From Swiss-Prot:
Taxon lineage: Bacteria, Pseudomonadati, Pseudomonadota, Gammaproteobacteria, Pasteurellales
Record bears the keyword DNA repair: no
Source organism of the structure: Haemophilus influenzae (strain PittGG)
Pfam families associated with the record: DXP_redisom_C, DXP_reductoisom, DXPR_C
Designated name of the protein: 1-deoxy-D-xylulose 5-phosphate reductoisomerase
GO biological process, one term: isopentenyl diphosphate biosynthetic process, methylerythritol 4-phosphate pathway involved in terpenoid biosynthetic process
Matching HAMAP family: DXP_reductoisom (MF_00183)
Annotated positions binding 1-deoxy-D-xylulose 5-phosphate: 127, 153-154, 188, 211, 224, 229-230, 233
UniProt-recorded Gene Ontology molecular function terms: 1-deoxy-D-xylulose-5-phosphate reductoisomerase activity; manganese ion binding; NADPH binding
Length: 397
């Protein structure tokens, strides 16, 4: 069996590291062909020494120069590239078999689209591709003959709970024809699901990044605390599974053992369960339609005391409601919301605004952008840039 060449867009981040762990557990099946990062020289250097990729690329030109010098000094033959164009070329490299698209934020958009346009098998962990590009992205997957597999634990759970006909028609699955009545998206509710609302004004960045169940980066941890993460996943799920608002349900499940579910018209509910470890969905997408060892502890049913479910409270999670409404408003609104949220979360982490200001800035940014029909990627980038400037101005006020 020939090894699969994997390109990891975002290898220095949380998902990237988990992907390398799966590769390490399956050295006979996978090879880390190219590793891509932002400007984290130290982590990339360590990864190059351990995994010996053909290529390593950093978005930051100066960081790439330092990395190149370090690798030469250690006699590591990995070729170092720099900048967005080089990253996009690696995402479409003819020798690449699978592309793990896990660069966080709008920065991951163009490299992910490059992989799609090269007809690659894309393991999608970058939320923004669908949140900002939606129909454009799904159409590109179809038109260029790419294969899309969802890595996010919730979407991967839904994917696994759907029939094979739906799995083969991502973005265009006729849910009702396949007997599906609802897609049930579960979320932990974050660290503040029981915190009294009057205490929200004094929530600190340290409290917000301490997620009870999952190990994640700071941005996604704050998004989990505001449930914007679930809002973005709602938008993604609607595009991935071609689901209407009526076919969607969002439930808070504090234990994060059930990762999402699918209701069928005959009364069945199929759920995917497992320990909260991203290596499971990563391994599932890498091996699909087969299975491979992920290095994850098996689920011990005797240790699970209970599984509980709570209806989401939009007073507690205004960002979740905002995301649902933004999808209904159109692509311009989800793009603006996503951009504003990136700026607002960073401002909160930098202690420039309060926890409750995040949702307010997101809403005000959408309200200041004129409704607009997005035709192409340039429109997306234009609205993204506009929204960021508006959000920055609101923060300064």
């Amino acid at each position: 069996m020939q090894k699969q060449n994997i390109v990891i867009l975002g290898s220095t981040g949380s998902i990237g590291k988990s992907t390398l762990s799966v590769i390490e557990n399956n050295p006979q099946k996978y090879h880390a062909f190219a590793l891509v990062g932002g400007k984290n020289v130290e982590t990339m250097f360590e990864q190059c020494i351990k995994f010996r990729p053909h290529f390593a690329a950093l978005d930051d030109v100066n960081a790439a120069k330092i990395l190149r010098e370090k690798l030469i000094a250690h006699h590591i033959p990995t070729e170092v590239l720099a900048g967005q164009r080089a990253i996009c070329e690696l995402a479409a490299h003819p020798d690449a078999d699978q592309i793990m698209a896990s660069i966080v934020g709008a920065a991951g958009l163009l490299p992910t689209l490059s992989a799609v346009k090269a007809g690659k098998r894309v393991l999608l962990a970058n939320k923004e591709s669908l949140v900002t590009c939606g129909q454009l992205f799904i159409d590109a997957v179809k038109n260029y003959g790419a294969k899309l597999l969802p890595v996010d634990s919730e979407h991967n759970a839904i994917f696994q709970s759907l029939p094979p006909e739906a799995q083969e028609k991502i973005g265009f699955c006729p849910l009702s024809e396949l007997g599906v009545s609802k897609i049930i998206l579960t979320g932990s509710g974050g660290p503040f699901r029981y915190t009294p609302l009057e205490q929200f004004a004094s929530i600190t960045p340290e409290q917000a990044v301490a997620h009870p169940n999952w190990s994640m980066g700071k941005k996604i941890s704050v998004d989990s605390a505001t449930m914007m993460n679930k809002g973005l996943e709602y938008i993604e799920a609607r595009w991935l599974f071609n689901a209407s608002a009526e076919e969607m349900e969002v439930i808070i499940h504090p234990q994060s053992i059930i990762h999402s579910m699918v209701r069928y018209v005959d009364g069945s509910v199929i759920a995917q369960m497992g320990n909260p470890d991203m290596r499971t969905p990563i391994a599932e997408t890498m091996a699909y339609p087969h299975r491979t060892f992920a290095g994850v502890e098996p689920l011990d049913f005797f240790k699970i005391k209970e599984l509980t479910f709570i209806e989401p409270d939009f007073n507690r999670y205004p960002n979740l409601k905002l995301a649902i409404d933004a999808f209904a408003a159109g692509q311009y609104a989800t793009t603006a919301m996503n951009a504003a949220n990136e700026i607002a979360v960073q401002a909160f982490l930098d202690r420039q605004i309060s926890f409750m200001d995040i949702a307010k800035i997101n809403l005000k940014t959408i309200e200041k952008i004129s409704p607009y029909t997005i035709q192409n990627i340039d429109d997306v980038l234009e609205i993204d840039a506009q929204a960021r400037e508006i959000a920055k101005t609101l923060i300064r006020e």
